[in-house]
Amino acid sequence: MISFITSAMQESPLFDKSYSMDADLSNAVAWNVARPDEKLKAEQEHIMHWIEERVAACKLQRHDVEWFRNCCPIVQKVSEGVCGPVLQELCDMIGHNDRAAPDLFRYGGPLIGKLPCTGNGKEHIFPAPTDVCDMWNSRATDNAALHNKLKEDKHSKFLMDQCKADAMLCRMSEPHLLEPDDVSGTRISPGFCVEQGLKEDGSLKLRAIYDLSRSGVNACTEAVEKLSYDSIDALFAVSRSFMQQGRPIAFLKADIDAAYRRVPIDPRHRWAAGVMFKYNGATQSSCHYSFPFGAKQLSMRGTELVHCLQTLRAKSFTCRCCASWMISSRRHQRNAQSMP
């Protein structure tokens, strides 16, 4: 298999015959090829040592108090798994002036409203979004209709069995969700679980998904561009350039673990983050403190974060995607999970 892939990268045409590497990728390839291995390795080890020391210091101090000053305590609690102060310091060190990613963990990200233009896509005119005021004013009526629907529907995907209900209820005790409670003041979206195979211990792996389209929350998001991501052609083109220069390469797919649940919701938008599902004849409800899987705004917030991480790893080669990296790099380069 390895020999087949190597041969394909050296000889086979790309899927898209018109594809050509972006200027930033071409420049990064040239920079990396010209860089002596020893110098590149020393620079990487220096920055990783700095990160490890700085993260350890932040954990001892329960994060920088000053950095979180005037921030919502719930946002700070959700953000404890991400070292926001170190992320901002790294951005300062490398001249990454976009504060969108660090600020996500400081103030929370919007769940509704107009999306900013990232430049990572083509301008597009979408249908007009639903008025947020209408969603707010109709929440009680629509919530009651959803509640009745869940009570009457005996074959809905929102009807949980024991295993799935236990998983959902367990998640409600974690920092990213309010414990089961009265959520009458929120806009409720129905929740369900999908199976994703088995965990290492043999237990069922489940992903909780919330239908924010059914509740109308996603309709309050106004997009201004169609996002585009690097294709497999980009990965092949970069890898081929490496190989043509006689550089050994390695591949790593690095997932950001529980990426969505690490991004807190802007406190002003929590009213739109209510969730509900049915179990054993009764409904269970809660409210999200972090982004639920199913929120339209997630694609943008994930893109902001990945763009920041890409800049931090500018001398590796990454293909953009929402919650994962595909990296083609020299074998001695440190793995992405070393990032804070």
Feature annotation, model-predicted:
Residues H147-K151, E179-P180, M326-N335:
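Conserved short loop/turn motifs at secondary-structure junctions
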